[in-house]
């Protein structure tokens, strides 16, 4: 399990260890306050971005001296590749442990993620 397995603000492991708690009841009045934590990490975006940049760089890696737009595409694809690789290393080497979804607490998905890390 990762640190995103929450149900009503409690870790799923804690709920399973305490079966006396009536938190898994399908009663709709209790489930309206569920906050859905999305397990999103920047590395999910950085790796495809790095591959896309590398693919674009490979596609335009021929003779770039004759075509100005091809030179521009090649330059920006290399820049995107480098940024993607830096972002991948940044996110994979981080020590983010408590990513939570702020804002709406009615069980709807929100996109604002807050990371409380000691290094960032």
From Swiss-Prot:
Superkingdom: Viruses
Q: Name one GO cellular component term.
A: membrane
Where is this protein localized, as stated in its record? Membrane
Q: What is its main location?
A: membrane
Residues that span the membrane, as ranges? 40-60, 72-92
Keywords, comma-separated and alphabetical: Membrane, Transmembrane, Transmembrane helix
The family note in this entry says: Belongs to the IIV-6 010R family.
List the protein's name: Transmembrane protein 010R
């Amino acid at each position: 399990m990762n640190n995103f397995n929450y149900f009503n603000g409690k870790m799923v492991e804690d709920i399973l260890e305490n079966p006396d708690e009536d938190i898994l009841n399908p009663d709709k009045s209790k489930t309206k306050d569920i906050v859905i934590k999305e397990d999103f990490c920047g590395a999910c975006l950085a790796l495809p971005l790095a591959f896309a940049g590398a693919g674009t760089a490979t596609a335009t890696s021929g003779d770039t001296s004759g075509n100005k737009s091809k030179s521009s595409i090649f330059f920006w694809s290399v820049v995107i590749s480098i940024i993607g690789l830096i972002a991948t290393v940044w996110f994979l080497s981080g020590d983010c442990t408590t990513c939570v979804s702020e804002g709406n607490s009615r069980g709807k998905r929100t996109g604002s993620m807050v990371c409380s890390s000691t290094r960032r």
